Amino acid sequence: MLLSFRPDVYEKIKSGVKIFEHRRNFPDEPIMAYMYVSSPVKAITGVVYLGKRHCLSDWLEYYKEDSNAVTRIKEYMETYHYRYAMEIDRFQETSQISLDDLRKNVPGFVAPQMYIYLDGTELLEHIESNLKMTDLQVEHSFEKIEACQVCVH
């Protein structure tokens, strides 16, 4: 999978501040996704490993005693129309593959608006042969999710 991220969101994931990825729709299975960072970066420059998918509606019930958490969850649901939060188990920084490189070497490449599946594509082959892992990795544990951690970034 290739997921699209704004540069500010990418930086929050890279720094370890952001521990959940919120989306309107998302598969209910662990995902390894390459990260495409939008303008001004315009490049694939990381890998994110997403674990368990949480329904925000379930969190509303679970955290109902914490009014601040309920307010944040409702905002994510009503303002941004998010339905799910995926645990960011791990982030791996990589070298960059620029948009120009992708357009030049992968016929018909268009930067994703949200996400695209890569299984069996030329794009996946190009990414796998050109992306190099760096030393930077960030890992998170989700043994206990506190109310103060939900819907904050």
Label every PLM stretch briefly.
Residues 1-26, 42-45, 53-153:
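Contiguous surface segments at macromolecular interaction interfaces
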Residues 25-35:
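Short coil-to-beta transition motif at edge beta-strands of beta-rich domains
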Residues 38-40:
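Short polar/acidic secondary-structure junctions
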